[in-house]
Design a protein with these regions (language model features):
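Membrane-interface "cap" regions at the ends of multi-pass membrane proteins
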Residues: 1-35, 64-69, 73-95, 253-257, ...
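Helix-loop-helix connectors at the membrane interface of multi-pass transporters/channels
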Residues: 2, 7, 81, 115-147, ...
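Membrane-embedded translocation segments of transport machinery
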Residues: 2-3, 7-10, 14, 176, ...
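Inter-helical loop and helix-membrane interface segments of multi-pass membrane transporters/permeases
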Residues: 8-11, 40-44, 74-99, 112-172, ...
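Loop-to-transmembrane helix boundary motifs in multi-pass membrane proteins
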Residues: 13, 19-21, 153-154, 268-274, ...
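Transmembrane helix-boundary motif of multi-pass solute transporters/channels
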Residues: 18-56, 205, 243-249, 259-263, ...
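C-terminal membrane-solvent junction of multi-pass transporters and transport-like membrane proteins
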Residues: 95-96, 101, 346-358, 390-450
Length: 459
């Protein structure tokens, strides 16, 4: 690369291995762990789905995660700079780096709004806004929030400003320190909420529905459908393909193998997803409500459950504090990628990159907010869809799987970085080593599976 008169600031590093693991896991852990994984698992045979999910997570998620981390650690930069450092002369792999930045920005264009919903409900439960409300009234709170661009926009803006403010203090003093605190608090909240759920009358039935293998339910759902659902969940849970994880690889040292780190990140992510089910299903079975998936589970079903139980205001407050932390750790992690990219591309200091990033994300997030009210007539995916649905389709169905395929091909083919160089980087340090015998899986099987995911997402 050509030298610039104003070179980008010296690259930072994590202060500790624990910091890297918690920040990376915080990036992976998000709302999908709570509003999708438990319900899909319950509907798809409980333990049957969980077993298939773990198999696909080890076979797909861990290898692709090591590839994204390897590109970052070996290239010492964001996706664009790392590709440039590792690609052969004249190659164009670095163009995917710009697509990664676009993907991170588009993800935040709607994820900040959803994170704002979590913050809004935390405040509502904390202040007693749900106390004494009937079931219909509780359900109506969510609809009224969606109809209010002022309320949604306010919480979205607060999420954006807080996220970039944390990042402005730097990797160690801002992102790492705050995320470590939130992740530790999140784990404590999970433990408290799960123990409380175990004391409810329907805990036994709820846990059996969620965790015990039920082949009858799996066959009824369709074994093929269960396999596809498990594969999709294992693939999308880590948010691979848009460089969100790659940036943290660039902040790593080479003391530990990437497979060891990837397994630990996946374990933390799975722990939160399974724990969410341990919280949700006992509560739903105890109060005779159906655990739907998606926003209706979080903002309608569970608030009704909380308002009907003793001490519901406290448990609702703790649950939405947990959800706020789960979503906000992702926001901070992806913001860090956007900031680091701006610092490298425009050769500016971190504080200035934070201001520019915050201004851009604030403006770019407005369509998602207005898509539920003033712009509700714009339905990009057909009747009933919203701007959020359209943005999520682009990120989840296109950018994530396509980007993962690019990282995969770059790391395992002779036209990219090359399998040998990737394997050397992945196995540098102490810990679990990726065996060379997996080369056929990585070069043949994984690309086919990812292409199938892309095709399935488009039909």
């Amino acid at each position: 690369m050509n030298q610039n008169e104003n070179p980008a600031p010296k690259r930072e590093n994590f202060a500790s291995r624990l910091g890297f693991l918690l920040v990376s896991a915080g990036c992976a852990i998000g709302i999908g762990n709570v509003w999708r994984f438990p319900t899909v698992a319950g509907q798809s045979g409980g333990g049957v789905f969980v077993l298939f999910y773990l198999i696909f997570l080890l076979a797909m998620g861990v290898p692709v995660l090591t590839m994204e981390l390897a590109v970052g650690r070996a290239g010492h930069g964001t996706a664009t700079q790392a590709y440039r450092a590792l690609e052969k002369q004249g190659a164009k792999w670095h163009l995917h780096g710009y697509l990664c930045l676009f993907g991170c920005c588009m993800l935040m264009m709607y994820y900040t709004t959803v994170s704002g919903w979590m913050l809004s409900y935390f405040v509502k439960f904390l202040t007693g806004a749900f106390s004494g409300l009937s079931g219909d009234a509780v359900s109506g709170v969510f609809g009224r929030m969606l109809e209010s661009p002022g309320e949604m926009g306010g919480y979205m803006a607060l999420t954006v400003v807080l996220g970039f403010a944390i990042c402005s203090f730097g990797l160690q003093n801002g992102v790492e320190r705050i995320t470590k605190g939130m992740m530790c608090a999140l784990i404590v909240l999970i433990a408290v909420l799960a123990v409380h759920s175990f004391t409810l009358s329907g805990a036994k039935d709820g846990l059996a529905f969620f965790l015990l293998p039920d082949w009858g339910r799996a066959v009824e759902q369709g074994i093929g459908s269960v396999l596809v659902s498990a594969m999709n969940q294992a693939f999308f849970t880590l948010s691979l393909g848009i460089g969100a994880m790659e940036i943290f690889g660039s902040y790593m040292n080479r003391d530990h193998t990437l497979t060891s780190e990837a397994v630990r990140i996946c374990a933390l992510d799975t722990f939160v997803a399974v724990s969410a089910g341990l919280i949700i299903f006992p509560a739903c079975f105890s109060y005779g409500v159906s655990p739907d998936a998606g926003p209706s589970l979080i903002f309608i079903t569970l608030p009704n459950v909380f308002t009907g139980m003793a001490g519901g205001r406290v448990w609702g407050t703790l649950f939405f504090l947990f959800m706020t932390f789960a979503s906000f750790t992702t926001v901070v992690a992806v913001f860090e990628n956007i900031i680091a990219s701006a610092m490298e591309l425009f050769h500016i200091e971190r504080r200035r990159a934070c201001v520019l990033g915050a201004a851009f994300i604030l403006l770019a997030s407005v369509p998602c907010v207005l898509g539920f009210n003033l712009w509700s007539g714009f339905q990009p995916l057909g009747a009933g869809s919203t701007v959020l649905d359209g943005e999520d389709f682009i990120v989840s169905n296109l950018l994530l799987p396509f980007g993962s395929l690019v990282y995969l091909l770059f790391c395992v083919t002779k036209w990219g970085w090359g399998f040998g160089r990737y394997l050397e980087e992945a196995n540098a340090g102490e810990g679990i080593r990726l065996p060379r015998a997996l080369k056929p899986l990585l070069q043949i099987v994984l690309p086919i599976l990812i292409v199938l995911i892309i095709v399935q997402g488009l039909i």
